[in-house]
Amino acid sequence: MREFVVLGTASQVPTRTRNHNGYLLLWDGEGLLFDPGEGTQRQMMLAGVSASQITRICITHVHGDHCYGLPGVLSRMVLDGVQHPVHLHFPASGEDVVRALVSLASPGLDLRLHPHGVGGMVAPGLEVRPLNHRIETYGYRLVEPDGRTLLPERLAAAGISGPDVGRLQREGRLAGVRLEDVSVLRPGQRFAFVMDTAACTGAEELADGVDLLVAECTFSDDDAALAEQYRHLTAGQAGDLAAGGDVGTLILTHFSARYEDVEFLAAQVKARAGGTIVLAANDLDRIPFPKRQRMAG
């Protein structure tokens, strides 16, 4: 199962209807928790997800609305008796803050800290890129390797059936038949998480060609001066990011508390997002990952 669970959508100040940040990506057997702000543990309960589903925690930067929920989440994992390793990724410059937060949680969890200081691969399929915020900040990108989808009619025409199908998949060639002769390319799915940044090259690299992009939408286009001052994206810039990367679906979040209704922000995004599907997130949304695409080949 692949699903994106929205736990909180506010930025610096929570509101009556929006909790601080928190997002859980359920990706087959893994659960990647992004930027757990205050109240994340309770939001998980309301969303119907379990702390035991978390296998990896990814923090973009150490501003409080992106990490102050960490002790509660870790304590809940200990309480629930989580036995599997939990990997925690964060910018190396914020290690003192992260270690202080971790120290507040009960001991006993197999927690493995992975500070990173440059862009690149930080785990199999998971990479980071530097963003442009007031402190060191990184976005995350998850990439599934490409695969092949077998075509039954081509297998039948080639006379391949039963155990030979598995052999062909493993070896790539069987009795003169190549795997690519009886299949089409199945591009791996791609996900990107871009928070707290002004427009920058790192954000563009993260968003490039992804099926699902989660991006901040802190300010309206009318408040571009504030966005520039605090190094955040405007709605229009979020749309540009999606259009430039040919993104499939864009989920907007991290809304300023000054906007009670965010639909006008979504409208500003859509005006510049090209063919990208645009969704304004609400707390406790559960969004199925977009269906994988199949390419002829």
Model-found features: residue ranges?
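Divalent metal-coordination and catalytic microenvironments
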Residues: 4, 35, 44, 61, ...
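Conserved beta-strand hairpin/beta-sheet module of binuclear metal-dependent hydrolase folds
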Residues: 1-47, 140-142, 183-194, 212
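Active-site-proximal loop/helix segment associated with metal-binding centers of metalloenzymes
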Residues: 125-206, 212-214
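Active-site neighborhood of phospho(di)ester-bond hydrolases with catalytic His/Asp-centered motifs
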Residues: 34-37, 54-62, 91, 192-197, ...
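Metal-dependent catalytic neighborhoods of phosphoester/phosphodiester hydrolases
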Residues: 69-77, 98-101, 260-269
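Active-site metal-binding motif and surrounding structural segment of the metallo-beta-lactamase
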Residues: 38-89, 113-119
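Active-site environment of divalent metal-dependent phosphoester hydrolases
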Residues: 13, 65-66, 97, 134-136, ...
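Binuclear metal-ion centers of metallo-dependent hydrolases, dominated by the metallo-beta-lactamase
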Residues: 200-297
